[in-house]
Amino acid sequence: MRITQGTFSFLPDLTDAQITSQLEYCLNQGWAVGIEYTDDPHPRNTYWEMFGLPMFDLRDAAGILLEINNARSTFPNHYIRVTAFDSTHTVESVVMSFIVNRPADEPGFRLVRQEEPGRTIRYSIESYAVQARPEGSRY
């Protein structure tokens, strides 16, 4: 199951040239770029681990791509995403994110149904990747 989170998630994986184009766009907008990774892609897991520090002062897309490749070699079986942060007053938020690396096997999610009092059914989803495997060894 292919995880669809962030910008471009329904498109085929981006090439390095396409990633560089997106990085240049982010830098031209004045956004700070960061790299994050995780092995738990649950949709509500919005707090991924930072790979290094956010690149507030970096203005070269090639340098950011070098850091992306370092993250790929360090965490080849994790999801890696690029985030672009807009520090403009009244925005001050991530305005763009896209996945630049994913594991070869994406196990997907299972739907959990739980009966509650009054014939109420509560639904939740769990990642197959986190079942019976600790963080860091899920892929």
UniProtKB/Swiss-Prot annotation:
Recorded GO MF terms: ribulose-bisphosphate carboxylase activity
What Pfam families does the database record attribute to this sequence? RuBisCO_small
State the Gene Ontology BP annotations. reductive pentose-phosphate cycle
The record, for SMART domains, names: RuBisCO_small
Kindly indicate whether the keyword Iron belongs to this entry: no
Q: What disulfide bonds does the UniProt entry report for this chain?
A: none
Is Isomerase a UniProt keyword of this protein?
A: no
Q: Fill in the subunit field for this protein.
A: Heterohexadecamer of 8 large and 8 small subunits.
Anything else of interest in the record?
A: The basic functional RuBisCO is composed of a large chain homodimer in a 'head-to-tail' conformation. In form I RuBisCO this homodimer is arranged in a barrel-like tetramer with the small subunits forming a tetrameric 'cap' on each end of the 'barrel'.
Function, please?
A: RuBisCO catalyzes two reactions: the carboxylation of D-ribulose 1,5-bisphosphate, the primary event in carbon dioxide fixation, as well as the oxidative fragmentation of the pentose substrate. Both reactions occur simultaneously and in competition at the same active site. Although the small subunit is not catalytic it is essential for maximal activity.
Name listed for the protein in its UniProt record: Ribulose bisphosphate carboxylase small subunit, plasmid
Organism in which the protein naturally occurs: Cupriavidus necator (strain ATCC 17699 / DSM 428 / KCTC 22496 / NCIMB 10442 / H16 / Stanier 337) (Ralstonia eutropha)
